[in-house]
Structure formats: structure tokens, C-alpha cells
Amino acid sequence: MIFKVLYQELPNEVPIRERTKSLYVEAETIREVRKKISDSDHNYNIEFVQPLDEAHLQYEKDTGKLELENL
């Protein structure tokens, strides 16, 4: 399953919507996504992890925003 992760790059600052970024991770569960990110070199402030259904996944592909992270 593909998950969309909304995050802030600076973990010590208050989240600001305009600074929110997203990445896409393939995993089985939300817990696995969080573990992959925490085990990587990234120190992100994760705001939300969203599983993508087929329609949403297709939309992300069509807009060209979908690029899977290799964590």
C-alpha cells in the first residue's frame, strides 16, 4: 500500500501549513511508515500519514506529484 506523509522539515518548530511538505512511502501499515522514516536519516515532524486508495493514488500519479521515497 502507498501512504502519503505530510511533514515539516524542522521538527522543533510549530507546524505551519505553508511549510508542510509531502512524501510517498510504500508499506503495509502506518506504524511501518513511521518506523521507516524514524530509521532513516530524516528528522521530520510527521503531521499526518494517509493511506491512498486507488482513486487518490491515480490522482497523485496524474498530477505528477507521486514519487516514492526509498527509505
Curated annotation (Swiss-Prot):
Catalytic EC class: transferase
One Gene Ontology cellular component: DNA-directed RNA polymerase complex
InterPro entries in the cross-refs: RpoY (IPR009907)
Gene3D superfamilies, per database record: RNAP, epsilon subunit-like (3.10.20.730)
Catalytic activity: RNA(n) + a ribonucleoside 5'-triphosphate = RNA(n+1) + diphosphate
Keywords on record: DNA-directed RNA polymerase, Nucleotidyltransferase, Transcription, Transferase
E.C. numbers: 2.7.7.6
Annotated GO MF terms: DNA binding; DNA-directed RNA polymerase activity
GO BP annotations listed: DNA-templated transcription
Complex and partners: RNAP is composed of a core of 2 alpha, a beta and a beta' subunit. The core is associated with a delta subunit, and at least one of epsilon or omega. When a sigma factor is associated with the core the holoenzyme is formed, which can initiate transcription.
Role description: A non-essential component of RNA polymerase (RNAP).
Family assignment from sequence similarity: Belongs to the RNA polymerase subunit epsilon family.
Identification of the protein by name: DNA-directed RNA polymerase subunit epsilon
